[in-house]
Amino acid sequence: IEQVNAMSKRVLIPIADGSEDLEAVTLIDVLRRAEFDVVVASAEERRMLTCARGTRITADTMLLDVLAQDFDLIVLPGGMPGAKTLGELEPLAERVRQQARAGLDYAAICAAPAVALHRYGVLKGRQVTCYPGMSDNLTGTHFLDQPVVVDGNCITSQGPATALEFALTLVERLAGRGKRREVADAMLVPATN
């Protein structure tokens, strides 16, 4: 049985003003519970950010300062206008394209698959999901109306209610089913199988 050193896994979570509160906090929390090295990076010109519902988050660092670093996973929360801000940030777009080309995991939830990953050009021909009202934006993809969709190294999810399943899926991708179960059990998530 392969033993994965969770702390050796690095995750980048870019956030902006207007990122979706529950998605951002769920991703940060669950991935840190899995003992990953999670870097929360501001796409704005300051570290203190205000999410879509008013939750304030202080980023660990500035996004442009860490884009040259290696990450096992880059994951974008949704929410508007946060996802749009991430979608329009060309240095992030190029970094996610590099991640995709290298066969490393990249992920997004809610509006972010439609307004960021699709804009970056990393979803063509992929099976994906997003916030249902935005699926028309996903031209050139195979939209699936499912909570979480994994297609190779691309992982997408629908929205706030699917954020926990999405985060646990990302834990499993990076550290295996046992780590997913350990994190889920500690959070009192009922076992599904």
Identify the meaning behind each predicted range.
Residues 1-6:
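Short, Lys/Arg-enriched N-terminal segments with co-localized hydrophobic residues
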Residues 8-15, 19, 30-42, 59-193:
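Active-site-adjacent pocket-lining segments in enzyme domains
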Residues 19-24, 48:
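Short N-terminal binding/cap micro-motifs at the start of the first secondary-structure element
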Residues 25, 42-45:
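Short glycine/proline-centered loop/turn elements that form peptide/ligand docking sites
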Residues 48-60:
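A cross-family phosphate/adenosyl-ligand binding-site feature
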